[in-house]
């Protein structure tokens, strides 16, 4: 008979959100044995962004236990011992294959069952694989993805095995840009391929993208736009040797890294909870349509108060904050204390080579570009504002200081009126500093 365990609270998923939720439970007061984290990964929760950045450095690379949560936000590092000391059970390397919300039961791949009173769904996303589309040769060796530490270890091993070789990066989003830089720093010959007219099209304007594309080109990264990978060639050992593109060209490759997005992991809950916009629908406290079941991070579609609409956000900042909000709401319900509704200011950032940008707010409306966006400058510093209905709704800054980044965040939060767009262009960062 497979084992059954009961907990008052269960967090399903072992990523960033799980770690920040555990810290909030400890802060609010949780008794030993009340809380469990069930994760299919073999390690305690860690800061996932390190995998596409410091983990791949050729020197002084980041390794666990160095980047367990909550170091990414300047907090204490929660090692496995921390969970034991708090009486929080870490149930690792455990895949849940069935969730029955009516009977409050989770079943693992080996038939173990876990029952709970309150569930936090923090399952995150899975990477979209080219094999999902039946791309020919997509299961060849050294075609890699990046989501978990295991994936990063495979990539590091491939980087070492194929030293100085040719890398093709499929995808022009965050992962594409960060990994192209990482492979270049590791002395690979790097080509980036994506179907859109410019990189990071969901956020960047053509002007912003032009800077990064030129900067990368100057660093020796080749960029192929407007086409996709339709197949891969492999040698007798099954190792990838080339990428065939839809435009007819063929790129030699020793390593291929694919970053074409993720899918929220909601399958276990299909038909049991209300869904919207590809995620599990929640209220401002991250409670779902099923009382006592909460969803946080990538999987949650929640009311974004600032813009008065339901949104789903895939970003580490929201994973941290939504997890904390859900725990505050759970504990608030128990103690009868009211909790403030989640009021999230969208925030995205990235770092690659010597660059680092931040974006706050909403990228809708007309845009202006200000500052020095010359990719050959020693220290480029430039930004953009998004203006709609006479107000600034979004702000982007490359190369900003901590104070300057705070200033653009304040602009996005307060949405100041703009009388004259030409004036705003001239003022640039000064406009933000005055708010």
UniProtKB/Swiss-Prot annotation:
Cofactor section: FAD
InterPro entries xrefs: FAD-oxidoreductase/Apoptosis (IPR050446), FAD/NAD-bd_sf (IPR036188), FAD/NAD-binding_dom (IPR023753), FAD/NAD-linked_Rdtase_dimer_sf (IPR016156), MDHAR3-like_C (IPR048618)
Annotated residues for binding of FAD: 14-17, 41, 48, 53, 96, 147-148, 298, 316, 349
Binding site for L-ascorbate: 320, 351
Induction: Down-regulated during senescence.
Catalysed reaction equations from the record: 2 monodehydro-L-ascorbate radical + NADH + H(+) = 2 L-ascorbate + NAD(+)
Main location: cytoplasm
One Gene Ontology biological process: cellular oxidant detoxification
Coiled coil: none
Residues annotated as binding NAD(+): 172-178, 196, 202, 261, 314-315, 349
EC number(s) reported in the record: 1.6.5.4
Keyword annotations from UniProtKB, A to Z: Cytoplasm, FAD, Flavoprotein, NAD, NADP, Nucleotide-binding, Oxidoreductase, Redox-active center
Domain of life: Eukaryota
Result of changing residue 70 to A: No effect on catalytic activity
Effect of residue 70 to S: Slight reduction of catalytic activity
Family membership noted in the UniProt record: Belongs to the FAD-dependent oxidoreductase family.
Name listed for the protein in its UniProt record: Monodehydroascorbate reductase 3, cytosolic
Organism: Oryza sativa subsp. japonica
